[in-house]
């Protein structure tokens, strides 16, 4: 009988979250939709497609009013990379927000987790995390790519 990998628990761990200044939206499109021209890249640009719908997380500045969307959201990225075997990261970070009745939209990328909170609740979310021992800092400035 083969042993399954042991998961590392995030219980009691503290994390550093980077807060991004850009305002994002979460838009819903019909299943099989092409990526529309208005879906601008942003700090976080994510496309999730299922058999029933397509969700896009993108910059909010160009989304047409007729498109079903929610936002604006402020993005917080958990400093990573996070090991795939690590468990409880989102629980440790989302439980304080649930207790404070702050809604979230979570997105995971290969190296880390992103937590989007309504922009009007971003300061409250940061304060809840700090109370639990987590660190919230402004996002590092990305290096400019040279041609």
Protein language model annotation of sequence segments:
Residues 1-96, 100, 124-147:
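Regulatory modules associated with amino-acid/nitrogen control
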Residues 100-115, 121, 142-145:
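A cross-kingdom feature marking solvent-exposed beta-strand/loop segments within repeated
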């Amino acid at each position: 009988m083969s042993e399954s990998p042991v998961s590392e628990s995030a219980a009691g761990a503290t994390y550093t979250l980077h807060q991004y200044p850009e305002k994002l939206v979460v838009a819903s499109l019909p299943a099989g939709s092409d990526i529309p021209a208005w879906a601008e890249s942003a700090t976080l640009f994510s496309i999730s497609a299922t058999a029933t719908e397509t969700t896009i997380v993108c910059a909010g500045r160009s989304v047409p009013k007729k498109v079903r969307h929610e936002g604006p959201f402020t993005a917080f990225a958990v400093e990573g990379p996070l090991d795939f075997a690590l468990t409880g990261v989102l629980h440790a970070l989302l439980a304080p927000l649930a207790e404070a009745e702050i809604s979230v939209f979570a997105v995971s990328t290969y190296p880390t987790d992103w937590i989007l909170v309504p922009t009007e609740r971003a300061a409250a979310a940061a304060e809840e995390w700090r109370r639990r021992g987590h660190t919230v800092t402004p996002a590092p400035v990305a290096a400019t790519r040279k041609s």
